[in-house]
Curated annotation (Swiss-Prot):
Binding residues for Zn(2+): C25, C28, C49, C52
PTM sites of type Phosphoserine: S97
Matches recorded under SUPFAM superfamilies: Zinc beta-ribbon
Pfam families per the UniProt record, alphabetical: Zn_ribbon_Elf1
Organism field: Schizosaccharomyces pombe (strain 972 / ATCC 24843)
Superkingdom: Eukaryota
Identification of the protein by name: Transcription elongation factor 1 homolog
Keywords from the named record: Metal-binding, Nucleus, Phosphoprotein, Transcription, Transcription regulation, Zinc, Zinc-finger
Family statement drawn from the similarity comment of this UniProt entry: Belongs to the ELOF1 family.
Main subcellular location: nucleus
GO cellular component, as recorded: nucleus; transcription elongation factor complex
Length: 107
């Protein structure tokens, strides 16, 4: 008779570290100064910087986490910055249009 085959020991699964609820502010660049709170009953997520006072509020779902509210804030800031660039480009094109310069030379 032969020996019994040895069973491999089952390794315990590592738990994922908890997600952060404090983040770096986009405006004043202080680390861990932005705190996030979620009100799942009313479906609202809030961010507030303790240093510069910036805040952001967005709609959340039952599955939302604080990082989702923070990423929504980043996306909103990028959208505002892109909108401002587009307005500046349009104003620059209107101010320096070749047609306007040609009409001024005619007169």
């Amino acid at each position: 008779m032969g020996k019994r085959k040895a069973k491999a020991k089952v390794k315990p699964k590592r738990r994922a570290p908890p997600l952060d609820t404090t983040f770096t502010c986009l405006f004043c660049n202080h680390e861990k100064s932005v705190s996030c709170s979620l009100d799942k009953q009313s479906g609202v997520g809030n961010l507030h910087c303790k240093i510069c006072g910036q805040s952001h509020q967005c709609l959340i779902t039952a599955l939302s986490a604080p990082i989702d509210v923070y990423s929504d804030w980043i996306d909103a800031c990028d959208a505002v910055a892109n909108q401002a660039k587009e307005v500046d480009n349009i104003n620059d094109q209107e101010a320096y249009s070749p047609e306007a310069a040609y009409e001024e030379e005619k007169e």
